[in-house]
């Protein structure tokens, strides 16, 4: 047993020398590349106890290689985590590319969206959400997705969906309604896109209220986008809508979106590009 322990100590304290390595004036092994020690002396007491006076150490180039390898592994793990979050978090895969980096910078509310990401810890702690409201095509969904993507890059789990998808999932789900809603509300941030566009049936409104109320009770922030006006949200048409809108407006700070319809502008740009391509083809014939 004693011999086995001694052999183990010898293996642990042994240093493997490369061809270019050399012994320095202090008696330690030095790296032939970076000329820093590959060994360190034990304290006198430890050396007497172990029967060995030195142990291996990283030279500068070994340390640099290890740090580079660990950084690459960490980066790869981060990329895999973010990819998994985006795959799970978006019901529309196209939204994975809706980022601040791809933004044209023309939306006046871009800084408001960036502020939410930069202040995420406070937004989460104080349960502050956004209600993006305004006309069609003004960039509400895009900036909401920008927030989602930016937080996912920080490895924060976000779910961005809409009530059309939620109602379909509830109808087709093999798990119970409560379990589905609980899973939806477990995300640190929930984003409901195109709020108010869902079916106005009694069943649909009841499910909408259930999700909104469950999110409210979870104490976690919610972001919603809607084409409804603030007037419509503050003065609903009936009691079922009043219950829903009251919960929503108590959770989310309203942010108005005005200005150009970016979708119409994009469609016009594509039309002009098509005309240009057709003209070029005609001229080449």
Language-model region placement:
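Active-site donor-binding loop signature of nucleotide-sugar glycosyltransferases
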Residues: 61, 105, 163, 257-259
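Walker A/P-loop nucleotide-binding motif
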Residues: 124-144
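Generic beta-sheet signal
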Residues: 128-132, 188-190, 222
């Amino acid at each position: 047993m004693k011999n086995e322990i001694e052999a183990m100590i010898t293996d642990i304290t042994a240093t493997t020398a490369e061809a270019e390595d050399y012994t320095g004036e202090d008696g330690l092994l030095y790296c032939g590349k970076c000329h820093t020690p590959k060994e360190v002396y034990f304290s006198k007491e430890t050396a007497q106890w172990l029967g060995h006076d030195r142990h291996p150490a990283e030279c500068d180039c070994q340390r640099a290689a290890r740090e580079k390898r660990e950084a690459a592994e960490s980066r790869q793990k981060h990329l895999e985590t973010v990819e998994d979050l985006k795959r799970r978090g978006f019901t529309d895969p196209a939204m994975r590319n809706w980022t601040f980096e791809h933004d044209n910078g023309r939306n006046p509310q871009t800084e408001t969206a960036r502020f939410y990401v930069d202040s995420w810890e406070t937004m989460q702690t104080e349960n502050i959400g956004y209600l993006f409201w305004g006309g069609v095509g003004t960039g509400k969904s895009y900036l909401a997705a920008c927030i989602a993507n930016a937080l996912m890059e920080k490895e924060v789990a976000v779910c961005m969906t809409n009530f059309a998808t939620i109602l379909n999932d509830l109808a087709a789900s093999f798990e119970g309604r409560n379990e589905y809603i609980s899973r939806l509300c477990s995300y640190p941030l929930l984003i409901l896109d195109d709020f108010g566009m869902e079916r106005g049936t009694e069943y649909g409104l009841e499910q909408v209220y259930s999700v909104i109320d469950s999110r409210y009770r979870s104490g976690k922030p919610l972001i919603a986008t809607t084409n409804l006006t603030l007037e419509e949200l503050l003065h609903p048409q009936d009691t079922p809508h009043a219950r829903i809108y009251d919960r929503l407006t108590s959770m989310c700070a309203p942010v108005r979106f005005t200005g150009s319809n970016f979708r119409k502008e994009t469609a016009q740009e594509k039309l002009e590009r098509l005309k240009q391509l057709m003209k070029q083809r005609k001229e080449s014939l």
